Swiss-Prot record:
Main location: membrane
Membrane topology value: Multi-pass membrane protein
Family: Belongs to the CD36 family.
Protein name per its UniProtKB record: Uncharacterized protein C03F11.3
Keywords in alphabetical order: Glycoprotein, Membrane, Transmembrane, Transmembrane helix
Side of membrane Lumenal, spans: 35-528
A GO cellular-component term linked to this record: membrane
Transmembrane feature ranges: 14-34, 529-549
Source organism, top-level taxon: Eukaryota
Length: 563
């Protein structure tokens, strides 16, 4: 009997050792070895470059020839109370029309790799094709019209007001006036009053040419094809010519290009340079510079520094971090680094706002079965009370909202990109979401919400793959108040909305299959095998313990019987 008990205990010991080995091996593999293998595989595969035969490697090919489902949706604003805005300082009231949906086709060309394989050049072209099936019922951008603030009017009235002020201060004009008023009492005061009268009645003169601060355009003209401003066509050219004839003051020649919100449909002048990730896979796709093919200095970065004319006040002495606004860093938002953590701040250069945006973690999400992290654009990005945003302040020539002339910058929630675009364009989140109160109340009809107005990036954290994204921005125009021109001295100065946009990206089936085949299927398979081994090992250990206990009990009973 003792022999059988001994055999049982030895067998239990062997089973225990086998179980312990399976348990330890399974835990080591699932918790240490395999994650390292997967991490190395992800890093090795996320490098932009070529195969040995000169073709694009898998990662580069999937990016360059992306099949993501991309749609650009526009909602445009139709102003309904322009008379009240101009004559009674009423807040703007608008009707929102849309969405006008456009299929976005992304193509890349002019690919080039540096000799050392560290850098890649490319040009990305966006082409937009109207899709009535995704748009609002009956919406037609080529026929639908909206009444909007005229950007050309604002630029033109600013320029002519400057010219008139220059003329009135011209010694020749003063001499002529005094000659006319010769011998009359208070000639100086009369000439001064006459100058103020001329400037004050400029609006009346302009109205004779059937020109207004607002104009009617089609949706397509506003977005893509462009419109010619009536202010230049009907008034400014003739008025400046008359002033030049009378006073000999040569005005600056006026360009009259079409005005549109998206002038780059189907074309691009920019060559981007990014890191390939050869040295550091976590920096794959990081922007290092961009340049204009036509050598337009406005669109040439200086290495990883944005064009200084975009943010000309970034180097002012009162900015504690003068270079913060000019830093070019991060990817272009098509993908992000591997192994994203919730505490990470993800940089991306967003050309729509002419600056780098830093995204922060918001919440966990699930997209088509994949677990992801949602990152959003925090309100701190447009908060000018923060030192790092000092360089984005553009002094207000005429003042705006409750801010006086020459104020340091706009209220928080707005971004002045006029130096980058060449027009009085102000960017914000749609419906002034998260903007300061003085901004959010400017259009009382707006009711901003997180779901409709926040920019969202849903990212698979292991690979940095964008599962889906919603880039939401509002395009506004800065309307100034010309206090010396009576007809325009009442209008509330501020950011008048023109349109808001939702540029959405969704994974295509190929991306889903790649994530499954390259990452999740192998991980799931190995994890399953390892945890089965762990479970089997734990079961064998439990079995061996039971065998020892049973053997001990049986041996003790037999021992009592024989004794």
């Amino acid at each position: 009997m003792a022999s059988r008990s001994c055999i049982c205990q030895v067998s239990a010991g062997i089973i225990f050792l086998i179980g312990a080995a399976l348990l330890v091996a399974g835990l080591v593999i699932v918790l240490n070895v395999f994650p390292n293998i997967v991490n190395n595989q992800i890093n090795d595969s996320k490098v932009l470059g070529l195969n040995a035969d000169g073709t694009l490697n898998s990662f580069t090919d999937s990016w360059v020839n992306s099949k993501y489902i991309s749609t650009m949706q526009y909602w445009v604003y139709d102003y309904t109370n322009t008379i009240g805005i101009m004559n009674r300082a009423i807040y703007p009231d608008v009707r929102e029309k849309g969405p006008y949906a456009f299929d976005e086709i992304l193509t890349m060309d002019k690919l080039n790799f540096s000799e050392n394989g560290e850098f890649m050049e490319f040009r990305q072209i966006q082409t937009f094709v109207f899709n009535p099936n995704k748009s609002c019922a009956g919406c037609d951008p080529y026929k639908d019209k909206v009444l909007i603030p005229d950007m050309g009017f604002q630029v033109g009235i600013d320029q002519i007001d400057t010219v008139i002020e220059g003329i009135l201060k011209n010694p020749l004009a003063a001499t002529i006036c005094h000659a006319i008023m010769k011998g009359k009492p208070n000639a100086n005061q009369t000439c001064s009053n006459l100058g103020a009268l001329i400037e004050g009645e400029l609006g009346t003169l302009i109205s004779l040419f059937n020109v207004s601060p607002f104009t009617t355009v089609t949706v397509d003209q506003l977005l893509f094809s462009g419109y010619k401003t009536p202010f230049v066509e009907k008034f400014l050219d003739e008025a400046l010519g008359m002033l030049h004839f009378l006073f000999g003051t040569a005005p600056k020649p006026l360009d009259d290009p079409p005005i549109q919100l998206n002038p780059l449909n189907g074309t691009s002048d920019i060559i981007n340079t990014v890191l390939t990730g050869k040295t550091d896979p976590l920096k794959a796709g990081y922007m290092t510079e961009f340049r204009s093919i036509s050598n337009n200095s406005l669109f040439n970065s200086i290495g990883n520094t944005l064009p200084p004319m975009w943010w000309p006040y970034a180097n002012k002495t009162y900015c504690k971090d003068p270079n913060s606004a000019l830093v070019l860093t991060g990817t272009n938002g098509d993908y992000f680094k591997n192994f994203v953590k919730k505490t990470d701040i993800l940089p991306a250069f967003v050309s729509d706002v002419c600056r780098t945006i830093h995204f922060v973690f918001d919440r966990e999400v699930t997209v088509k079965g994949f677990k992801g992290y949602r990152f959003v654009m925090p309100p701190t990005q447009f908060d000018y009370s923060l030192d790092e945003n000092c360089g984005y302040c553009i002094p207000l020539k005429y003042g705006s909202y409750e801010y006086p002339a020459q104020s340091a910058c706009l209220p928080s929630g707005l971004l002045d990109i006029s130096q980058c675009t060449g027009g009085p364009i102000i960017m914000s989140k749609p419906h002034f979401y998260q903007a300061s109160k003085v901004v959010s109340k400017f259009v009382p009809r707006f009711k901003p919400t997180y779901d409709n107005d926040e920019t969202m990036l849903d990212i698979e954290p292991n690979t940095g793959t964008v599962l889906q994204a919603q880039k939401r921005l509002q395009i506004n125009m800065l309307v100034n108040q010309f206090k010396h021109i009576r007809s325009y001295s009442v209008m509330r100065p501020g950011a008048y909305p023109l349109a808001w946009v939702n540029e959405s990206f969704y994974m295509d089936q190929n991306t889903i299959d790649q994530l499954n085949s390259q990452l999740f299927t192998p991980v799931s398979t190995v994890n399953t095998i390892c945890w089965i081994a762990v479970g089997l090992g734990a079961g064998l250990i439990a079995l061996s313990i039971v065998m020892v206990i049973v053997s001990f009990c049986c041996f003790r009973d037999e021992h009592h019987k024989t004794s």
